[in-house]
Regions:
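Sec-dependent bacterial lipoprotein signal peptides
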Residues: 1-18
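N-terminal leader/targeting segments and the immediate start of mature chains
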Residues: 14-73, 81-83, 195-202
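Charged, amphipathic alpha-helical segments
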Residues: 21-26, 86, 156-165
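Short, solvent-exposed coil/turn segments at beta-strand boundaries
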Residues: 31-37, 60-73, 92-102, 148-149, ...
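Glycine-centered tight beta-turn/hairpin loop motif at sheet-sheet or coil-to-beta transitions
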Residues: 50-54, 82-84, 111-113, 158-160, ...
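An acidic-aromatic
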Residues: 60-131, 186
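Mixed-charge, Lys/Arg-enriched low-complexity segments
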Residues: 137
Length: 202
């Protein structure tokens, strides 16, 4: 009887956080169903290196292709550190005749000779795109927990990555994302979430 009451109490406590209902894990990522633009700033530490580096960037994500929130045009424009200021990395999806999409990534940076564009030959620039891809709902929801002030966290795991999204009460976009993958760890605050009309693949 005591164990039953304990379980019932725990269940009622969970319900006392309405944002942590089972549907919250789905509703939390409603922003990713459309194009959006945010500002991210924080730190990243490469794998095997515990020294964090600071960064800030504008992230724009286009409309999802075929209902898949992870398939879309992406752009990351860095404002810091100084070595990356003005650098833009874009991933563009081009439709093919067979209904598939070809993904092309371009690294662009300003120089004394004008703007230089370097098309990716492989995946050498994918590390820059992780700050955008971390905002897309990949894998599966593996944890949903309430936090102070009516907020909650959602943990997603899959594809060799794990990300913890912190949502504040009443906020449409996550206010913080913690990402861990084979490249290392990223801690970033998210602000200025807004719908975006750009980066819409034809």
């Amino acid at each position: 009887m005591r164990s039953f009451l304990a379980c019932l109490t725990a269940f009622l406590l969970l319900l006392s956080f309405p944002s942590c209902s089972p549907s919250a894990s789905r509703d939390s990522f409603a922003y990713a169903a459309e194009a959006f633009s945010v500002t991210v700033r924080g730190t990243y530490a490469p794998a095997g290196d515990s020294t964090p580096r600071s960064f800030a960037a504008e992230v724009t994500a286009g409309v999802p292709v075929g209902g898949d929130p992870t398939r879309r045009d992406l752009a990351v424009v860095f404002s810091s550190p100084p070595s990356l200021k003005g650098v833009t990395v874009t991933a563009t999806l081009t439709p093919g005749p067979d209904g598939t999409y070809q993904r092309s990534v371009v690294f662009t940076y300003p120089s004394d000779y004008g703007t230089i564009e370097i098309p990716a030959k492989g995946r050498e620039f994918d590390g820059f795109l992780r700050f955008a891809e971390a905002l897309l709902p990949f894998g599966d929801v593996t944890d949903l927990s309430p936090v102070a002030d009516g907020g909650y966290t959602v943990t997603r795991t899959g594809e060799g990555r794990e990300a913890v999204y912190t949502f504040a009460e009443g906020q449409t976009f996550p206010v913080r994302v913690s990402l861990t993958d084979s490249r290392g760890a990223v801690e970033m605050a998210v602000s200025g979430g807004a719908a975006s009309g750009g980066l819409n693949p034809s």
